[in-house]
Amino acid sequence: LWDATLHVYAGTAIYEFEPAQQSSAAAPLDLVRGILQELQQTKSLRELCDQTAYLVRRLIGFDRVMVYRFLEDGAGHVIAESCAEELDPLVNLRYPASDIPKQARELYKRNWIRLICDVQASPCPIDFSSASGGAPLDLSYSTLRSVSPVHIEYLRNMKVGASMSISIIVGGELWGLIACHHMKPNFVAANLRAAGELLGQVFSLQIQTVEGIEAYVTMRAARALLDRIVAEFPVDGDLIENLAQRLEPLSAFINSDGAGIWIDGIWRSTGLSIPMTEVA
């Protein structure tokens, strides 16, 4: 038996065939229904990402699953991870933007899921001359498309045998990736990949929901803090000293190590802050 996928791009129909696996009979929705219910019960972004890493690893059986978030400068930050006990954790590590260049990110926006079942395998050429009049066949949306040799070498250097990634797209932009690594070659069946893609789409929507809730809660808390400061602010006394006495709750609210205020050459601070000589 074979699993087959079909997509049409630029007027060309592309069929892809792969040997069917024993798990291929299960429908993707049946595989992830329970997982989706668990994700919808999470209350914070951290809990959502931690739970997603654990559940994806349980679904596909890889040695390591990471939630990898792109920062404003293009660098990547591993914000959640589930991995085998014998592996060194990578959570909280950051990687330069050059690890996943802009061109690669555009492909991640086109394809929700990407699988490299064996990093040691040799790519197979495609004879497209007769079908396309000699023009290169665009495999941007192909499931079995080969990947950059540079990326393959990168995975080999990490001692990775197989890799799978699920795109996280929030508001039309690539927010991050669910990156999955296995130390040995590992072929993920088509229905499991479809389940992973569905999970990635729901996860992306859930991120948007949770981030919206967290932003609203933060805004309400900021408003309440500001109202309290204004209500308690003395109508007389030294302005700078009165402001300085309220630096600590402001610093705690934004989770900073310290805060300071500089008015007319006078510096007041709380917690860990820079000396006045560096402010002047």
Protein language model regions, located:
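Sensory/regulatory domains in signal-transduction proteins
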Residues: 1-27, 60-63, 76-77, 81, ...
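A general structural signal for short secondary-structure junctions and capping/turn motifs
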Residues: 5-7, 56-59, 68-70, 85, ...
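GAF sensory/regulatory domain recognition
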Residues: 11, 68-129, 262-280
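PAS-family sensory modules
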Residues: 12-45, 136-147, 202, 207, ...
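Alpha-helix initiation and N-capping motif
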Residues: 28-32, 100-101, 109-113, 121, ...
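Signal-transmission/dimerization alpha-helices at domain junctions
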Residues: 38, 42, 55, 59, ...
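Signal-transducing coiled-coil/dimerization helices and immediately adjacent hinge/linker segments
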Residues: 40-66, 70-71, 209-274
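Active-site-adjacent "gating/activation" loops or surface patches in catalytic cores
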Residues: 114-159
